[in-house]
């Protein structure tokens, strides 16, 4: 992967150098100019859909004055994404770059070292959240990762990257985005702050609906026949969970022991539903159901927003609309 990124960076730098040679030698005079003084659109690059949608919400009508890019717009999820030379170039001269900051974004550091815009603002979601970021948890019954099976110790803890699935985290992160947009584009500072405040109220309202749903539910445990990227969500509302794999797992095949454990948990807890995430083939979930006593549990899907397409965005999908749909699924799952 590192060799791949190095080749990309060399390619990008050659292209940028050729491009620079054809420009007038005036760039040094505008290094400290604000975006509006340069008369150009604000360039914002995001990696994943939630970041992209948050910028849109904060920008409001000013989105017409932005060149906003979502890199992961073709269904590739965060854990398997590899940037193209075009992606690296977009990052290189943007005004604001927003990324998650976990292990899946290991390529970012090298990309930023070669950035043309030295005044670029960068938001690392995990850094913004600080010590509230959670380590990935291998819970009872989960399929162990290869490193753990071989007895190798990891050099450092692996953090759960799916921080956007907490509405409480979303409030913190949108505030950080708004603050940086205000510094980049002071002319529209009041608009950004007003939009961020209004969006924060929507997040608060939905957060309370989630808590109310959990408080009223008789069932407090979710069981995933799939990867589990919803750690932040369940922790926010005091829910318990079981799952086949951790959130960042690359595994797709569950062992007999894992399926047996999860099937027995369904029976033990009297669960009526087994959950998967978007794009799942549901094979593991179906096998779990087939091995329960009743064999009649529903298979539900929660959307982790890791595979949101540009077409979904064009058709009106937003962060809030996905979280609202997830709430409806949660209501059914907790029956």
Where are these regions (language model features)?
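Alpha-helical transmembrane segments
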Residues: 11-15
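Extracytoplasmic metal-acquisition and chelation regions
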Residues: 6-9, 21-335
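Bacterial Sec-dependent N-terminal signal peptides
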Residues: 2-4
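C-terminal motif of bacterial Sec signal peptides marking the signal peptidase cleavage site
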Residues: 16-20
């Amino acid at each position: 992967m590192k060799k791949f990124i190095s080749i990309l960076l060399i390619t990008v730098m050659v292209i940028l150098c050729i491009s620079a040679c054809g420009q007038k030698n005036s760039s040094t005079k505008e290094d400290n100019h604000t975006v509006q003084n340069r008369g150009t659109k604000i360039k914002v690059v995001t990696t994943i859909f939630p970041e992209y949608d948050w910028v849109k919400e904060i920008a409001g009508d000013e989105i017409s004055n932005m060149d906003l890019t979502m890199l992961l717009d073709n269904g590739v999820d965060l854990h398997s994404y590899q940037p193209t030379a075009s992606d690296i170039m977009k990052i290189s001269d943007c005004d604001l770059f927003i990324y998650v900051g976990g292990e899946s974004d290991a390529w970012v550091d090298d990309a930023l070292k070669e950035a043309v815009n030295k005044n670029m603002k960068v938001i690392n979601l995990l850094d913004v959240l600080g010590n509230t970021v959670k380590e990935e948890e291998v819970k009872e019954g989960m399929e162990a990762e290869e490193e753990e099976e071989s007895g190798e110790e990891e050099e450092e803890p692996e953090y759960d990257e799916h921080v956007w699935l907490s509405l409480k985290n979303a409030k913190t992160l949108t505030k950080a985005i708004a603050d940086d947009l205000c510094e980049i584009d002071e002319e529209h500072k009041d608009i950004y702050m007003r939009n961020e405040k209004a969006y924060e109220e929507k997040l608060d309202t939905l957060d309370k609906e989630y808590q109310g749903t959990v408080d009223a539910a008789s069932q407090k445990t979710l069981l995933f026949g799939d990867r589990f990227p919803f750690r932040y969500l369940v922790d926010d509302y005091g829910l318990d969970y079981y799952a086949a794999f951790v959130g960042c797992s690359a595994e797709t095949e569950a062992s007999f022991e894992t399926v047996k454990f999860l099937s027995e948990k369904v029976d033990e807890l009297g669960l009526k539903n087994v959950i998967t995430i978007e794009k799942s083939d549901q094979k593991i979930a179906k096998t779990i159901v087939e091995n329960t006593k009743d064999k009649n549990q529903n298979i539900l899907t929660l959307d982790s927003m890791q595979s949101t397409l540009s077409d979904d965005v064009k058709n009106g999908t937003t962060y809030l609309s996905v979280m609202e749909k997830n709430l409806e699924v949660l209501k059914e799952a907790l029956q």
